[in-house]
Amino acid sequence: MNRRPTLLAALALTATAALTLSACGGSGSDEGSAKDKDSDKIAGADTGSEKSAPPSESASVTEGRPKIELPPDLSYTFDWSKTGDKEKDAILADSKQSIKAVHLAMANQDALDAAYLYYHEGEAAAGAEKFIQAYVKEEARVTGAYRYYKASVNVSDDNSGSLVYCEDQGKAYDMFLKDEKVNKTPVTKNSYVLYNTRLQKNDKGVWVVTKLLSQRGSDRCQPSA
């Protein structure tokens, strides 16, 4: 994980190759180098954008999937255009939910929250659990606005796939729950993170994240790139 607030930096260092979904402008080291694979597609201008849906709209349309009901102070923009390929578009859709599910676990202060475990398995699940637990210990969660862009998705014949994408955390911060204090930090090069995820389609037809690597300050994710 990257993008850690100062207080949580040391704790999150143990969450190797897991999700980086925290405050703006953190300075910690990377937990893995993202492998740039077939990917530098230009994101559309505010296409596919979305805010956190209200509770009545936030449940997945597929029966049996967990509801992702997030606090109203969290919002998301996904500049991920549909590809027209059924499986690739399913990876994009499930990846949106996997990102939000980690934030939900933080909001619920539950390192074993069912929603993120539904969308993560193996190494990715273990890393996410450690990351979430660091927030639970400090009674903190994330707040603000996240933007995702420059997505490149691939599917293999063995029901595995990959998704490489950028995250803009310039308007995302950590909030401490006891007094609702928000740790606002300046936007820097490190506010932009490149992710490389490995996914597997499980027996429920869900594309679950099995491994996630990240690179903070990636040149490819900078606003001028």
Where are these regions (language model features)?
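Bacterial N-terminal signal peptides that target proteins for export
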Residues: 1-11
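Hydrophobic helical h-region of N-terminal Sec-dependent signal peptides
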Residues: 13-17
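Bacterial signal peptide processing site
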Residues: 25-28
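Post-signal peptide N-terminal segment of mature Sec-exported envelope proteins
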Residues: 34-60
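Phosphate-binding/catalytic loop of phosphoryl-transfer enzymes
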Residues: 63
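Core segments of small alpha/beta cavity-forming domains
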Residues: 66-141
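Structured, amphipathic secondary-structure segments that form assembly/contact surfaces
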Residues: 111-114, 118-224
